[in-house]
UniProtKB/Swiss-Prot annotation:
UniProt-recorded name of the protein: Histone H2B
Keyword Acetylation: yes
Reported modifications of this chain: Monoubiquitination gives a specific tag for epigenetic transcriptional activation and is also prerequisite for histone H3 'Lys-4' and 'Lys-79' methylation. GlcNAcylation at Ser-103 promotes monoubiquitination of Lys-111. It fluctuates in response to extracellular glucose, and associates with transcribed genes.
Modified residues (N6-acetyllysine): K4, K11, K14
Pfam families: Histone
Ranges for region Disordered: 1-25
Residue ranges of coiled coil: none
């Protein structure tokens, strides 16, 4: 290898050991995209729309978690089970949306339990 290449390689190595690694930003975007392709295979999504969807998923997640936590606390329980999650969903989501969410959730839990 030439001197320049060796210098570059050395620099790259140095920056890694210094801890200049890019911070990972977690998001639901790959899952949102997979669901989009299931319901509308020929539809795309802009990065701004994806960001909004990601915020929406995070918001709903936090609301359900907080409500489930409250329910567990009211009933002097220290564990959040699928029952608390289901009740939280019923309390947070309106009518038909809650029914569909509960049935999808039940389906997912059943699938997970049977695969174990």
């Amino acid at each position: 290898t030439s001197g320049k290449a060796a210098k570059k390689a050395g620099k790259a190595q140095k920056s890694i050991t210094k801890g200049d690694k890019k911070k990972r930003k977690e998001s639901y975007s790959i899952y949102i995209y997979k669901v989009l392709k299931q319901v509308h295979p020929d539809t795309g999504i802009s990065s701004k729309a994806m960001s909004i969807m990601n915020s929406f998923v995070n918001d709903i997640f936090e609301r359900i978690a907080a409500e489930a936590s409250r329910l567990a606390h009211y009933n002097k329980r220290s564990t959040i089970t699928s029952r608390e999650i289901q009740t939280a969903v019923r309390l947070l989501l309106p009518g038909e949306l809650a029914k569909h969410a509960v049935s999808e959730g039940t389906k997912a839990v059943t699938k997970y339990t049977s695969s174990k």
